[in-house]
From Swiss-Prot:
Its main location: cytoplasm. This is Protein kibra. The keyword Chaperone does not apply. Residues 896-910 have a biased composition (Acidic residues). Residues 1-60, 541-560, 841-869, 890-912, 942-975, 1224-1269 are annotated as: Disordered.
């Protein structure tokens, strides 16, 4: 026994890796596996506890490595291993015997902080990324094979379209040569007997049209060739990926290769970032050159005309923009801010809803199917055009052989078209309908993002003008990239606006499909949505000659009938605030130029615009449940200038544009907003005045007396506001000047609701300067017995009132049902004399109330805002009520996905900060309750700390009320009497303490803080780093290889784009220096070039650029929302399909200058060129035979594709043959990159093993040195391998 122990001890000492491993190898080995030691150690400890009931077999022993990791010694075979020999008794032997999440004997799961979980096969001495228990890898391979089969059919469609287009080009060239020959001969022996053929002018015009047609067909042929090259390259990449994965053992990468691929992807990503900067700089240079060419062309045409690139004064349109908050006192600004916060919260909720709808919609759409449907429809159209071209050929001068060939070609085309028409295309129509619905949701989302950004900027402007704080960053505006320490996400690789071409016009495509396939069902289909009828010109059309996507000028909203044009489904949808914007998407598509020009700063809008957005949206939300006409719903109360048709003749010469137009009006109509924005000229012709509730009000100011005369004349159709019975009810009008109105004036009560005539005049003493800062609020009140109810309101801005004139206008009344709640008016009604006396008393000085608050001058100065607003503070009960409503709303930002990136955490924190700072308040209830309950003591007094307390004898009565203590800043004067025991006065020295609303959490006052704003600007809490984002979605080697090849493809096309942009820049610079008119005309008229430079136009307003970033971020959020629906541990099929379709999508195309702008001009008069022209004339018979042969060959190659759109192939798919493309018509696919572009966009060679490196996928063939370690290594009999546990 001692000998055995000694032998075991010696053997253990001999086999211990700490003594056998060289020092260098030991350190390298320890560093390589240091990250997984703890987890594997825990695993083996659990294994020891689990195997404690079973003894070790004979000849086995347990030892620990220098780092504490347990391994096992087989003394019989003289080997060491990580596997416990007792696993054969406790673990299943095969995967079929496993239950739940068990792994069979010899398998181990480990975790790497960079690549996540991976698996070790100790028996086969290998590691792999895939989970061996899941069959996701097999599903991926089958999906890849199916897609390659479908992509092969799509490629055949493109090639057949190329053949048909080439045949059309041949016929067009033949027609052009016929016309040239006829024009050059200029004799009666022409090929046609028509006398019009002999007119030189007509011949010249026909020749011009034929030349343009040939040029256009060549351009279309170039586009198709580029599409074929993009598709072929993508399919070749997918084939190479599949072959590379299948060539490996088990189709899996080991961990070392995964690390190498990951490092290579990060390096390529850095190259992409630097290359994108180079591309952006080139595009900005192209914009400058294009503008210079435009100036040169305009100066050549007419030097007297002003350049359109000069600055245009829009002072008349932006006169409303000024800082409206400057003329608003604290109370009105507080109310305006609360309304804006409420709107912002509602918009955020609506955006979340749209994102969820888009995430649900994407699941019903097959990735890449839209491109296939487009190719199929365009192929049929090309055949139709070729058939029309053949039918238009005159056969009189043709030989019999030519006639026979033409007839055969026509017959073949007719048969192909008949088969296409008779095919079942219901699926195509349904898919296009899904895409159209998706486009509609995207348009709604874009409008929602615009409105949200406008409100966000509005809130930031409030923050700069008041003491309320708002976070400097918002999730909607921040678009930080993922951390460089983490791997690239799906959205970083595959969601790139420059990686794919412009989106397809789905509406145009669906119209084509309806015309081709479903002409007999057009009446049963839903009409196209008005928004989609006016796609922007930035979207690419299906063909250069397509006229289906032409823009139409926007019409006036007053000419739009929603009930007639919108579908019932659209009418039943929940309306959004976007319907009330100046360019509402439900009414008319906003033109890009006027909006960007007028609204360069959306947060400078007047408060009336925001009120319109809220009130009009509430109007539609309450009335869109039933299919109502817009004419039935009353417009919002307006203070807009009436049309010239409403003004008397003596007032037509007066203009109100010079008056102060800063307004505090509650709302304006859609017409006034759109009219002010310059989109259209407001029209009165279609205003349904007879169905609106209106009030006629007269205003006149007497300067000598200092009195405003208000005349409440009559009303019209008040029954539109009163839903109950008008029997035993009366109505009267009540008016008050807001804010800080002591009194209100009221008319007599009448029983007529249809056309009541009041004829009541009141005099309100007020100075002119104060009058221009107020607004007149007129409310319509009904009385039924002792009960009074407000049924409508009108608010008129006195800023637009001209004191020199007397006005008498009709104003629309907003119904009270569109406002959440109205509090009863507690302001007593008085006569004009009483009002004058009250105003006079309020203007009297009161020196007894002037008390010095603090000797600190800085504190007094910084408290001016709160001091001026002390009389506008709402009562404490109202604040507590609003706080309770805030708590009831709950947070807006719900966690979307458990595996968000670090930047998403920051954005969520910004969202919470913004929401907490903004405070979600019920705007209408706060506004009206505050304005009606407010009581003014003094108008202009300094800091007041005195107040009237309830006498002690009234404590018994006050017990019935709320006994909660009232904590208020001493700089505020409470508007209600409280007991001294309930009132706690605090003298705050910070400039922001006294104005902080109840929605902001209190923070400790920091003495000596920067600018004494410790409560406004406080440091954000550090982000928690304890949360680990461990994804449970399986990731395979095929996913990793696809990601790597996608990065290489993006880099390849980026170098291609940079080279083309550099070439285009050089050519345009030379043309600009030489003042070449042809190149200048091409740069201005080419639509593709215009779309390209529009992406980087510095003249584009920052809001549009921010909107593009928001759309990009929203796409990522939609992807995350869709991922949350995938069950935990299940593969995401849609994401994988999007990965493989990424390779066959066409990237951003850069236009190339044509080598020849025009074909050689034909001279119809000179006959010296007759012989030369005859030599250029083609043999018509040979041309027709060649066309027929090519058509038959292409038809045989692509027969019955519509019946088998997704033909799956079993086994490996053969390599793609080369496309049948004419060399003369094929442009250079990969021009050499310029040295600057190559140095900026090509990644440096790195000494890493890259098993996924593709020679054809890299932009530059930089040699990558293979990592080799030829150093002398010592060999031992037994060395513990830390991965496999076998002898090395």
């Amino acid at each position: 026994m001692p000998n055995l122990q000694q032998t075991a001890s010696q053997s253990q000492h001999h086999l211990h890796p700490h003594h056998l491993r060289p020092q260098q190898q030991q350190q390298q080995h320890h560093h390589h596996h240091q990250q997984q030691q703890q987890q594997q150690h825990t695993h083996h400890q659990q294994q020891q506890q689990h195997h404690s009931d079973f003894p070790l077999p004979d000849g086995w022993d347990i030892a620990k490595d220098f780092d504490g990791k347990t391994y096992y010694i087989d003394h019989i075979n003289k080997k060491t291993t990580w596997l416990d020999p007792r696993d054969c008794y406790t673990k299943p032997q095969t995967f079929e015997d496993c239950v739940g999440d068990e792994l069979p004997m010899g398998w181990e799961e480990s975790y790497d902080p960079n690549i996540g979980p991976y698996y070790i096969n100790h028996l086969a001495q290998s590691t792999q990324l895939e989970d061996p228990r899941q069959e996701w890898k097999t599903v991926q391979e089958q999906m890849l094979s199916d897609y390659l089969s479908a992509a092969q059919d799509q490629l055949e469609n493109k090639r057949e379209m190329f053949d048909v287009k080439q045949q059309r080009l041949l016929w067009a060239q033949e027609e052009y040569n016929h016309l040239k020959l006829a024009a050059s001969r200029s004799s009666l022996c022409s090929s046609s007997s028509s006398m019009s053929r002999h007119d030189p002018e007509l011949l010249r015009a026909d020749l011009m049209l034929a030349r343009e047609r040939v040029h256009q067909l060549k351009q279309e042929l170039t586009h198709i060739t580029n599409d074929i090259s993009y598709t072929e390259r993508g399919m070749n990449t997918l084939y190479s990926v599949g072959e590379k994965i299948n060539a490996r053992e088990n189709g899996c990468y080991d961990i070392a290769e995964v690390h190498a691929i990951r490092e290579e992807m990060l390096k390529v990503h850095k190259s992409l970032v630097s290359g994108e900067k180079v591309r952006e700089e080139l595009m900005r240079s192209l914009v400058q050159i294009k503008n210079e060419l435009g100036r040169q062309q305009i100066s050549e045409e007419n030097s007297d005309l002003a350049s359109p690139f000069d600055r245009v004064c829009v002072a008349s349109q932006t006169d409303l923009c000024g800082s409206s908050g400057e003329n608003l006192n604290g109370g009105a600004r507080f109310a305006e801010m609360a309304k804006t916060k409420w709107q912002y919260a509602e918009w955020r909720k609506h955006i979340k809803k749209l994102q969820q709808q888009l995430a649900d919609h994407v699941e019903r759409i097959e990735p890449g199917q839209l491109e296939s449907d487009k190719d199929r429809i365009l192929l049929i159209q090309e055949k139709e055009k070729l058939l029309n071209d053949l039918n238009s050929i005159s056969l009189k001068s043709r030989s019999e052989e030519e006639k026979r060939v033409i007839h055969q070609t026509r017959h073949k085309l007719e048969e192909d078209l008949k088969e296409a028409y008779e095919a079942n295309n219901t699926c195509v129509a349904n898919r296009l309908r899904f895409h159209e619905e998706k486009q509609l949701l995207l348009d709604k989302l874009q409008e929602a993002l615009k409105s949200t950004k406008l409100l966000e900027e509005r809130l930031k402007s409030f923050s700069s003008e008041s003491t309320f704080s708002i976070s400097s960053g918002s999730s909607l505006g921040s678009l930080s990239t993922a951390s460089s320490k983490s791997a690239l996400s799906f959205t970083d690789i595959y969601i790139d606006p420059f990686a794919v071409d412009s989106p397809i016009d789905v509406v145009d495509l669906r119209r084509r499909s309806q015309r081709l396939f479903q002409q007999h069902q057009q009446q049963r289909l839903h009409p196209v949505h008005p928004v989609l009828q006016q796609q922007q010109s930035a979207e690419v059309t299906l063909s250069p000659r397509s006229s289906l996507s032409m823009e139409t000028p926007p019409a006036s909203p007053m000419k739009y009938n929603a009930g007639a044009d919108q579908t019932p489904q659209a009418l039943k949808e929940e309306p959004t605030y976007a319907n009330a914007l100046p360019a509402p998407p439900a009414y008319t598509a906003p033109p890009p130029v006027p909006i960007s020009g007028v609204r360069a700063r959306p947060y400078d809008l007047d408060s009336t615009v925001l009120d319109c957005m809220m009130l009009e949206a509430k109007l539609q939300k309450l009335n869109m449940g039933t299919p109502l006409n817009l004419a039935v719903a009353p417009l919002s109360p307006i203070s807009e200038k009436p049309s010239l048709l409403d003004l008397p003749q003596e007032m037509l010469s007066r203009s109100s544009s010079t008056s102060n137009t800063r307004s505090v009006s509650a709302a304006v109509s859609n017409e006034s907003v759109a009219g002010d924005s310059g989109v259209f000229e407001a029209s009165r012709a279609h205003l349904p005045r007879k169905e609106l509730a209106q009030v006629q009000i007269g205003l006149k100011y007497l300067k000598q007396e200092g009195v405003l005369v208000v005349s409440l004349e009559r009303a019209n159709n008040l029954l539109a506001l009163w839903t109950a019975s008008a029997d035993n009810s009366q109505v009267y009008l009540r008016a008050a000047l807001l804010p800080n109105s002591l009194t209100s004036i009221r008319t007599k009560a009448l029983g007529d609701f249809q056309k009541p005539v009041f004829n009541d005049t009141f005099a309100v003493p007020i100075t002119l300067d104060k009058l221009l800062t107020k607004s007149l609020q007129v409310t319509v009140v009904t009385m039924t017995g002792q009960k009074e109810e407000i049924i409508g309101t009108v608010q008129i801005s006195m800023a637009e009132f001209n004191p020199e004139d007397s006005t008498l206008k009709w104003y629309n009344v907003l119904s009270s049902k569109f406002i959440p709640s109205f509090e009863s008016l507690d302001i007593p009604s008085t006569s004009a004399a009483a009002a004058a006396a009250a105003v006079a008393a309020s203007n009297a000085p009161n020196p007894g109330n002037n008390r010095e608050e603090s000797s600190d001058e800085s504190t007094i100065t910084s408290s001016q805002t709160s001091t001026l607003t002390r009389n506008q503070a709402p009562c404490m009960e109202l604040q507590e009520q609003m706080a309770a409503e805030l708590l009831g709303l709950g947070p807006l930002n719900e966690p979307e996905c458990s595996d968000d990136d670090d930047d998403d955490e920051e954005e969520e924190l910004d969202d919470k900060q913004l929401v907490s700072d903004v405070g979600l308040m019920n705007s209408s209830s706060m506004l009206h309750a505050y304005l009606q309950n407010m009581k003014q003591e003094f108008a202009d007094k300094e800091t007041n700390t005195d107040r009237a307390y309830l006498p002690e004898k009234s404590r018994g009565q006050s017990q019935l009320m709320d006994d909660r203590p009232v904590k208020r800043s001493q700089t505020f004067t409470p508007s209600e009497a409280f007991s001294k025991n309930r009132y706690n006065c605090r003298l705050n020295r910070s400039d922001s303490d006294s104005a902080m609303h109840c929605g902001v959490a209190p923070h400790t006052f920091q003495r000596g803080a920067a600018e004494r704003r410790s409560l406004r600007f406080h440091s954000k809490a550090p982000k928690s780093v304890t949360k680990l984002h461990h994804t449970h979605i399986p990731r395979t080697s095929l996913d990793l290889e696809l990601d790597l090849q996608a990065q290489h493809s993006k880099l390849y096309f980026l170098n291609d784009q940079i080279a083309k942009l550099q070439n285009l820049k050089e050519v345009l610079q030379k043309a600009c220096e030489n003042k070449d008119p042809l190149v200048a005309a091409w740069a201005i008229e080419n639509e593709e070039f215009q779309r390209l430079v529009a992406r980087a136009d510095p003249a584009k307003c920052p809001e549009e650029r921010q909107l593009q970033k928001l759309l990009m971020k929203t796409a990522k959020e939609i992807h995350k929302l869709r991922k949350t629906k995938v069950p935990k541990g299940c593969p995401d099929l849609v994401s994988f399909k999007e990965k493989i379709t990424f390779f066959t999508r066409k990237g951003l195309s850069v236009p190339e200058l044509p080598s020849e702008f025009t074909l050689p001009e034909a001279n119809p008069i000179e006959e010296e060129e007759e012989e030369e022209d005859e030599n250029e004339f083609y043999n018509s018979a040979e041309t027709a035979i060649a066309i027929n042969t090519a058509l038959v060959a292409s038809s045989n190659r692509n027969k019955n594709l519509s019946e088998h759109p997704h033909r799956a192939t079993s086994g490996a798919v053969p390599k793609i043959p080369a496309p049948v493309v004419t060399p003369a018509a094929t442009p250079a696919a990969t021009p050499a990159a310029t040295p600057a572009a190559t140095s900026a966009a090509t990644p440096a060679a790195t000494p890493v093993v890259s098993p996924a490196a593709q020679p054809d996928a890299k932009p530059a063939d930089a040699p990558i040195p293979v990592a080799s370690n030829d150093a002398e290594q010592q060999r031992f009999d037994y060395v513990v391998d830390r991965n496999y546990g076998v002898e090395v």
